[in-house]
Every structure is written in C-alpha cells, then in structure tokens.
C-alpha cells in the first residue's frame, strides 16, 4: 500500500519533496502511530482509514486496490483459479449490496484493535470500497512498476519475471474464466 502512496504523491510533488520515515508495519500499528502523534501522516487500509476519519483525521489522497492476489510457487494454477472464482462470486455479491456485507467486514476485524469495536456500517464511505474482479497484472504495468520500485531503491536488481510468474498468472485466470 505504501507504494501506491508514493506514486500518488509523485503526481503532486517532486520526488525530492516527498519525505518518508520508517513506520510500523500494518495499518493497526500505523493508525496508533498517527493518533499518538508519532507520525504526521501515514498510509492506512480499511477499516483503519474509516476509524481515523471517525477520530478527526483527514484523508489527503486515496487509491483503490488492483484486484490481483499474488500466490507463492506452492499454489498450483487450479487452486489459484478456484480462489479467483470464489473472489469473483464475492465481488458480485458485495457490489450488489455493499451495505449488506459491511458488518461481516467489521466483524472480521474486531479484536485486532479496540477502535474497530466502535465502528458501524454508517462510519464507512461505501463508494470508497471498490471491489473488482481478479485479473492478471498486465505485463507493461508490471514492468513499469518494477522500474519505478527500482528507481526508489525498494528492490534489488531482479527481472520482473522473477517477481511475478506472468505465465502461471495468465493460466490461472484463464482457467477461472471457464
């Protein structure tokens, strides 16, 4: 998620004006760091974004989830395809009535942070929740993202093909479409 934040900030600021710091891993810890004044701004995912807004924080920029899960080599194409079929079905159901499914989302996160217990469905901006079908990462997008990550020094010099098996990804998505 922090990669997306860097990319969005680059749309408004020259790279040399983007100041970063080491922040805790995970939205729960980053939310706490923000609320406790340890950082001035941070990247949050839901439900912590809505929790931050509920507690007076302001959203500066936001983006949406791509819709592709990355699997390890231990996951074969058929298993990945079955997973994608299930996700597609869930996307259809949730997009048909986001409000209906939000309580499941809240319940899933309860116990991870005491603030989550205070959230209700009305605390979420449902238009922010963009559920999209899983799809392969287009090769050009993968290459562009890889080059961009290298330019920030986020990854070592590897081939994008080492990071994502484009062929396996494509096969799995084709199988799930059947």
Region locations from a protein language model:
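Short aromatic/hydrophobic-glycine micro-motifs
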Residues: 14, 57-58, 154
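Secondary-structure end/capping motifs
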Residues: 77-158
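Mature, folded catalytic cores of secreted/periplasmic enzymes
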Residues: 16-17, 34, 117, 121-122
């Amino acid at each position: 998620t922090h990669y997306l934040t860097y990319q969005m900030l680059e749309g408004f600021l020259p790279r040399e004006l983007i100041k970063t710091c080491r922040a805790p891993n995970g939205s729960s810890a980053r939310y706490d760091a923000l609320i406790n004044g340890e950082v001035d701004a941070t990247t949050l995912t839901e439900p912590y974004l809505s929790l931050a807004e509920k507690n007076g924080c302001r959203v500066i920029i936001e983006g949406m989830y791509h819709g592709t899960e990355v699997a390890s080599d231990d996951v074969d194409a058929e298993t990945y395809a079955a997973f994608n079929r299930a996700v597609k079905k869930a996307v259809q159901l949730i997009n048909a009535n986001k409000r209906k499914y939000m309580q499941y989302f809240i319940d899933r996160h309860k116990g991870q942070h005491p603030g989550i217990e205070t959230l209700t469905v009305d605390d979420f901006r449902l238009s922010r929740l963009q559920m999209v079908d899983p799809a392969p990462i287009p090769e050009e997008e993968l290459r562009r993202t890889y080059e961009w990550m290298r330019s920030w020094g986020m990854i070592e010099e590897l081939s994008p093909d080492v990071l994502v098996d484009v062929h396996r990804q494509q096969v799995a998505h084709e199988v799930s479409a059947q």
